[in-house]
A protein has these predicted regions:
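Disordered inhibitory propeptide/activation segment of secreted metzincin zinc metalloprotease zymogens
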Residues: 1-95
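GD-rich hexapeptide-repeat beta-solenoids
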Residues: 71-73, 77, 82, 140, ...
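Low-complexity acidic/polar repeat-biased segments
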Residues: 328, 335, 339, 429-477
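Parallel beta-helix/beta-solenoid
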Residues: 298, 335-346
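Acidic, glycine-rich calcium-binding repeat modules characteristic of RTX/beta-roll
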Residues: 14, 91, 171-179, 202-216, ...
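Metzincin-family zinc-dependent endopeptidase catalytic domain
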Residues: 28-69, 98-219, 226-235, 284-288, ...
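Acidic glycine-/aspartate-rich tracts in secreted/extracellular proteins
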Residues: 79-81, 124, 135-138, 169-170, ...
Length: 477
């Protein structure tokens, strides 16, 4: 389903002169999926991608056993002889301290989103998941080519084990946002039953994006993918995700169920994060954030206030945001709800959802769209545009509040309602419909913007604008 399917077709409203609606309309179509082809590849819905990544139908609960929790153990191998190494690799090296620390963090990222628990045990023979390094090929030569491999769930000796080429520097130091940490999370995905999104493998020929089954097989959508996010319009500036992404979360939740105990309080992602997860946390304006958020409850906030770039922030489940000068680097997993957003000092576009959102644009010339719900909208410094595009964006029974409208600087964009150029500002409603009435409430110190769209006896639409008496010139129609 298109993200804008329930709303007015804005294509005509967004053509011609500039409107805030134009930015919102473009953002609604951002990374739209599941409808036709992208280039010569079919575009998959989230559900289709989920099923593709889980096409092996294997879990630690058995084949074709879905949605059942799993209590797993893990261990770090201490010694393996060449004769006992899997796939004829040789030259065992045990995990170093940095690898152990980062492996624990990578395991936690999977446990956060699905009903899988991981308990560390000392004896590898008692462990479900085992970690080790290799250094040599089957003929005893130093392996400078391969990266890592992992085995799916099963009942044979090395099922659920993950192996890493210790000759690769990024495997020795798998830091946040680097390929080594990404590789850890990827291989753990295999040990839990996830496949590559396409039928390719680094050990089989020289695969490329030409070999993908569907267009969204990139590292923007899935940590299980081999392919650069640029193929789907993302840009991570050479950085990498450290935990499961949107399609991975859907896939692992299919296998083991969703973890509904994860972050049920009021959680902040980005700056001032209280997640206790490094990949959800920004410490300064140079921090690259690459994540898909899973959150099981509370009143939650995207805080991207420390960035000065022009950002596009979406609070709609299943969509992407452009955060901190990257593109398509933040997403919200299906079923998760984030209620609030704080922009930075650039010219941001922020789109809310059907919850009661609190959206703060920060400095810069921002475009804010609250969508449904009783939203609180704060533009901040700069020339801001507050967009309304749907008759249910601000109901009379649950109105939005604009907290800091500045006459001569800010605008309220109603052009989506004026496609036929019949929206009128009036002193009183006539019952004809498509009328806007501005009423100054001195006691409340606000302008009440009423709209009578349908022509029946009561107003359909109300926005409260604090602190100033508005005139028709304050609107884009």
């Amino acid at each position: 389903m298109a993200l804008y399917s329930k709303k007015t077709d804005l294509s005509s409203a967004s053509s011609g002169g500039y409107t805030g609606v134009a930015d919102v309309y473009q953002f609604w179509n951002y990374h739209h999926r599941g409808d036709g082809n992208i280039g010569d590849k079919p575009s998959y819905t989230l559900e289709q991608a989920r099923d593709q990544i889980t096409r092996g139908n294997v879990t630690w609960n058995g084949e074709n056993v879905f949605g059942k929790p799993a209590a797993l153990t893990y261990s770090f191998l201490q010694s393996v002889s060449d004769a006992n190494m899997p796939d004829n690799y040789k030259g065992f090296v045990k995990f170093n301290a940095a690898q152990i620390q980062q492996a624990r963090l990578a395991l936690q990222s999977w446990a956060d989103v699905a009903n899988v628990t991981f308990t560390e045990v000392k004896n590898p023979q008692q462990a479900t998941i085992k970690f080790g390094n290799y250094t040599l090929t089957s003929d005893g030569h130093t392996d400078n080519n391969s990266q890592a491999f992992g085995f799916y769930p099963g009942n044979w000796k090395w099922a659920g084990s993950a192996w890493f080429n210790y000759n690769q520097a990024d495997n020795q130091r798998p830091d946040i946002n680097e390929f080594g940490r990404n590789t850890l999370a990827h291989e753990i995905g295999h040990t839990l039953g996830l496949y590559h999104p396409g039928d390719y493998d680094a050990s089989d020929g020289n695969p490329g994006y030409k070999d993908v089954t569907y267009a969204e097989d990139t590292r923007q959508f899935s940590i299980m993918s081999y392919w650069n996010e640029g193929y789907t319009g993302g840009d991570f500036h050479g950085y990498h995700a450290a935990g499961p992404l949107m399609d991975d979360i859907a896939a692992i939740q299919k296998l083991y169920g969703a973890n509904m105990t994860t972050r049920t309080g009021d959680t902040v992602y980005g700056f001032h994060s209280n997640t206790d997860r490094d990949f959800y946390t920004a410490t300064d304006s140079k921090t690259p954030l690459i994540f898909s958020v899973w959150d099981a409850g509370g009143n939650d906030t995207f805080d991207f206030s420390g960035y000065s770039s022009n950002q596009r922030i979406s609070l709609i489940s299943g969509t992407f945001s452009d955060v901190g000068d990257l593109k398509g680097n933040v997403s919200i997993a299906a079923g998760a709800v984030i209620e609030n957003a704080i922009g930075g000092s650039g010219n941001d576009v922020i789109v809310g959802n059907l919850s009661d959102n609190h959206i703060d644009g920060g400095a810069g010339n921002d475009v804010l769209y609250g969508d449904g719900g009783a939203d609180i909208l704060t533009g901040g410094a700069g020339k801001d545009i507050f967009v309304y595009a749907w008759e249910k964006d601000s109901l009379a029974s649950a109105p939005d509040t604009i907290t800091d409208f500045q006459r001569g600087e800010d605008k309220i964009d109603l052009s989506a309602f004026n496609k036929n150029h019949d929206l009128q500002f009036v002193d009183h409603f006539s019952g004809a419909g498509n009328e806007v009435l501005l009423n100054w409430d001195g006691q409340a110190n606000q302008t009440n913007m009423w709209m009578h769209l349908s022509g029946h006896s009561s107003a359909d639409f109300l926005v409260n604008i604090v602190g100033t008496a508005l005139q028709p010139s304050d609107f884009i129609v």
